[in-house]
Amino acid sequence: MGIAKDILHIFEPNPLACGQAVLAMLTGNDVQKVIEEVGTERETTLLQMRNFLESKGISMGKCRKPVSDKNELPQFAVLSLETPKCWHWSLYADGRFYDPEYGVLEDFPPSARRYYWEVKSI
């Protein structure tokens, strides 16, 4: 399957489902289907994110990397961001940020600390 050919933005269906929305955008799946497959509509762990992506033919880098500028990011990346409210999953794809809470952005959503894992189709 691999990474979706066209990334379409999806808002998180509830304030705790940012990870599921990122997985849905990255794979082109329906977010409710992702929730069922991941097994929770609440916060997702790194392991849940990685396992879901691998089951869809997408590899996720083994190490998280700090990032401060969008020019440091690879073509596709899953982001972990420390936002004013909580830690938050987001997606970077082809020069744009697809954030489950804030929408499609040209730069990072509001965040103090930022990390990423590169993702690639296997």
Segments and roles (model prediction):
Residues I35, G61-A93, E101-Y102:
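Active-site-adjacent substructure of cysteine-protease-like catalytic cores
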Residues M1-I58:
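Active-site nucleophile-adjacent alpha helix/oxyanion-hole segment immediately C-terminal to the catalytic cysteine
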Residues D30, T45-Q48, P66-D69, E106-P109:
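General structural signal for secondary-structure boundaries
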Residues I58, R64, A112-R114:
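Short glycine-aromatic motifs
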Residues L26-T27, S68-K70, K120-S121:
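Extracellular and analogous surface-interaction loops
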Residues F97-I122:
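Noncatalytic regulatory segments and standalone regulatory/sensor domains
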